[in-house]
């Protein structure tokens, strides 16, 4: 079988992939500035409404652990659009939820299947020249991080202008459009010749052998946890104590957008 095409020269495809990374990752963060609106809409306590954020992050972590490895043994060209389609279904379920448990189910589906971004990025590394890997990964990571930061701002904006559910509808539609666009554009790469269980064994061996990788993974995990704790709880403080609208709460995340944009240059 011929080698996969080098996508580093296909700027249109790279932009599609970066947009998909941003949309998938950002889908987990729409609820953060909307906790107060969710609380009022479903007439529940603040703590119950805040569980939406918890379910989003826990399901995302489970998706990273158990669904992303499937991408190593599956046909990524078909698997990525499938994940994005399932994620869109979760977004639509959240948008048309009539009670809080229904929103939670939609949130869990989004969290589990939004990990398409973490399958897209390894695919990119397999389809570029080694000297271009850092640049391409940096570009896709910029898309992912900008998507996370913009997601809360846009969620707050649409909540103020229309309704808090609007962002879920729009995101679901865009997700389906991007899934369809990528389905016919993603290059095929060879699957790994190991079964699903062997992947977990290899990951454990890798962490045991590569201490530096383990340390960097822990550092990244703790750093991201700190940021998540800040943005998850600040919404409660700003809405209840300071009575700020969803728009202002969502705008807080824009502080980090410059750091996100710099990742593509760091990759070079």
What is each residue range found by the language model?
Residues 62-98:
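Conserved MFS/SLC helix-loop-helix module at the cytosolic interface between two early adjacent transmembrane helices
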Residues 10-30, 210-226:
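Pair of pore-lining "gating" transmembrane helices in MFS-fold secondary transporters
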Residues 43, 75, 96-101, 243:
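Helix-breaking motifs and short loop linkers at transmembrane-helix boundaries and internal kinks
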